[in-house]
């Protein structure tokens, strides 16, 4: 009996479908596995799990409780301005300066680092080693001001307790408060995010000036909200007013500023940002560098400048960029 082409096609169709489905499944599996391995490698999850399971004697052997240390302050105490720059690291500098770019995105910060004291692990502009538990903003703040990583789960009682935020920790803010300093921290976002307000209220009795405070004090309109709250251009202008007021108090002050415009993934383009680079994020970084430099120049023109120490640090590395150099 003769068979037409249609009969042959009908008989072969199921096998072709199985072959096609098998290939699609295999490709899908490779894509999923590849994406998973990329994420594990790029976000250093393997290292995180390894470090969490490993027990060391670091604190037993090296940690010094600041409560037990006698600190001697000079009779004329120096003021402190500490600027936390969101996601800023030396990878944005030119390779010639120790960075990862052909051309520096932040030449002003490069110049400030070279003209002043720069803590580095080599002869160029280096960086600190970012440990587990210091890789996001509040964790970095705890790490820099208390000397410990923030390894407590977000849902733990000690993390969310509004009246008992790590009561056993003794921080820089508490040391300064004990020695007569006025502490203030300013940010253009909501300080309740990440329990930042809990940390600073309970460790140094900081006056917290954030987005909510700016609305309450009439510095911005009630319906004003860009990016995370208000932009860094306003932050530096508000900081000038508050620092001027603090300087007239007759007491030493510690002012901490927390920028936000360079937050990932693309940052916030304010009216002062230029469009020099193809990448929006690169343009925002360049804008931040100019803003910080302008603020420093303003500080230099103030009568209190000679008795003030200004510290500029990145809060943490940019997690979306994988660079083999861990100290950046």
Residue ranges and their predicted role:
Residues 1-12, 325-327:
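Short, small-residue-biased leader/transition segments that mark boundaries at the very start
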Residues 1, 62-66, 293-296:
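Short, motif-level signal for alpha-helix interfacial/capping segments enriched in acidic residues
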Residues 13-29:
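Membrane-interfacial entry segments at the cytosolic side of transmembrane helices
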Residues 115, 244-250, 297-307, 328:
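Secondary-structure transition/capping motifs at alpha-helix termini
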Residues 291-324:
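Metal-dependent active-site segment of extracytoplasmic phospho-/sulfohydrolases and closely related
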Residues 28-78, 82, 89-253, 260-276, ...:
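Active-site-proximal alpha/beta segments of enzymes that process anionic O-linked groups
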Residues 201, 258-265, 311-320:
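Acidic helix/loop microenvironments that form the catalytic cleft of cell-wall polysaccharide enzymes
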């Amino acid at each position: 009996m003769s068979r037409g082409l249609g009969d042959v096609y009908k008989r072969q169709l199921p096998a072709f479908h199985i072959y096609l489905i098998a290939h699609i499944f295999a490709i899908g599996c490779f894509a999923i596995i590849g994406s998973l391995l990329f994420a594990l490698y790029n976000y250093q999850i393997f290292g995180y799990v390894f470090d969490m399971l490993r027990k060391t004697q670091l604190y037993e052997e090296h940690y010094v409780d600041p409560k037990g240390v006698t600190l001697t302050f000079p009779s004329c105490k120096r003021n402190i301005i500490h600027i936390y720059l969101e996601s800023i690291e030396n990878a944005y500098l030119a390779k010639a300066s120790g960075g990862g770019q052909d051309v520096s995105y932040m030449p002003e910060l490069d110049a400030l680092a070279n003209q002043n004291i720069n803590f580095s692990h080599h002869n160029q502009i280096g960086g600190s080693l970012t440990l587990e538990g210091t890789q996001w903003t509040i964790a970095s703040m705890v790490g820099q001001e208390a000397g410990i990583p923030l390894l407590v789960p977000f849902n733990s009682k000690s993390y969310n307790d509004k009246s008992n935020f790590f009561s056993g920790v003794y921080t820089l803010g508490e040391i300064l408060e004990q020695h007569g300093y006025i502490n203030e921290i300013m940010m253009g976002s909501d300080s309740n995010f990440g329990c930042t307000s809990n940390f600073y209220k309970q460790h140094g009795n900081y006056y917290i000036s954030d987005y909510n405070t700016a609305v309450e004090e009439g510095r911005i309109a009630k319906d004003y909200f860009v990016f995370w709250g208000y932009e860094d251009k306003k932050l530096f202008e508000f900081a000038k007013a508050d620092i001027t007021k603090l300087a007239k108090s007759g007491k030493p002050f510690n002012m901490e500023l927390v920028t936000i415009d360079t937050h990932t993934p693309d940052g916030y383009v304010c009216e002062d940002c230029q469009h020099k680079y193809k990448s929006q994020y690169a343009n925002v970084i360049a804008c931040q560098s100019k803003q910080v430099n302008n603020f420093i120049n303003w500080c230099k023109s103030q009568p209190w400048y000679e008795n003030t120490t200004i510290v500029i640090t990145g809060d943490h590395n940019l997690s979306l960029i994988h660079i083999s150099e861990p100290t950046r």
